A protein has these predicted regions:
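Intrinsically disordered, low-complexity coil segments
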Residues: 80, 84, 158-165, 182, ...
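Phosphoinositide-binding peripheral membrane targeting modules
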Residues: 95-169, 179-180, 189
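Sequence-level detector for tyrosine residue identity
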Residues: 21, 42-45, 69, 147, ...
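Gram-positive cell-envelope targeting signals
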Residues: 1-11, 20-27
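Anionic N-terminal interaction surfaces
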Residues: 16-111
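Intrinsic-disorder/low-complexity regions
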Residues: 1, 52, 135-136
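Terminal and domain-flanking low-complexity segments
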Residues: 3-13, 170-232
Length: 232
């Protein structure tokens, strides 16, 4: 038999063995993490993650306080609605009022709570600032918040076993001159593993934990400041 015919079989077996090995490493590393204990480090992680992983947020805020921050996204329904408005050639006064050119954004987006203002940032494909929208306390006091479930744009991308790492969302809806405008709040910062850390499962998991600890506190801090955002 030509040895070349054995190569595909060898690759498949090697792939299966690698997956089993990585799964064991994942389970071992995961068992060493106490999420409740890690949540007590929120203040430390908030500063550490901001300084080391997302320094651009401080740059965009230009010296303003950063009371809480997390990842964000534009719901598909909102993007479709805006797209319909654009395609119909209708001037959307509500969107113009806040100066945001909403579309289906697949690039990084962030929320930052600063004092009584909510800042929404979107980036372009190279991570540079694209849009910066500020919702003041009057807008927020008229807003509503509801649970939105797992981020729908990412469904199907991950295996079922990895669902625990998918961001869960809340949907904040603003009343902009009588027109509802909905945006998503993630319960964790978006994590993209560094290729050099592909075998370092401990580092991957602790980074995910830090991002979750920082992100999931955002809604609670927001609700404490704005009681009208309590979820029924």
């Amino acid at each position: 038999m030509n040895p070349l015919f054995l190569i595909p079989a060898v690759l498949v077996i090697a792939g299966v063995c690698f997956m089993i090995y990585m799964n064991k490493k994942h389970q071992s590393a995961k068992s060493e993490i106490d999420l409740d204990f890690e949540r007590n480090k929120y203040d430390v992680y908030k500063q550490e993650v901001l300084a080391q992983d997302f320094p651009q947020i401080k740059q965009w805020m230009k010296g303003k306080s950063i009371d809480a921050y997390t990842s964000a996204s534009v719901p598909q329904s909102t993007a479709n609605k805006v797209q319909d408005v654009i395609s119909d050639g209708i001037k959307n006064v509500a969107l113009s009022a806040i100066g945001v050119k909403l579309r289906r954004i697949e690039t990084e987006c962030f929320w930052v709570l600063s004092g009584s203002d909510l800042h929404f940032f979107s980036t372009n494909t190279v991570g540079e600032l694209d849009e910066h929208v500020v919702f003041d306390n009057f807008r927020i006091e008229e807003a509503t918040l509801q649970y939105g479930g797992i981020l729908k744009s990412q469904l199907g991308v991950y295996l079922k076993s990895s669902e625990e790492y998918l961001p869960k969302t809340h949907i904040i809806t603003f009343n902009i001159d009588g027109t509802p405008l909905s945006l998503e709040v993630h319960d964790r910062l978006n994590y993209v593993p560094d290729p050099t850390d592909i075998l370092n499962m401990n580092k991957q998991l602790i980074t995910r934990v830090k991002y979750q600890v920082v992100g999931e506190k955002f809604v609670k801090i927001l609700q404490d400041k704005f009681p009208n955002l309590q979820v029924a």
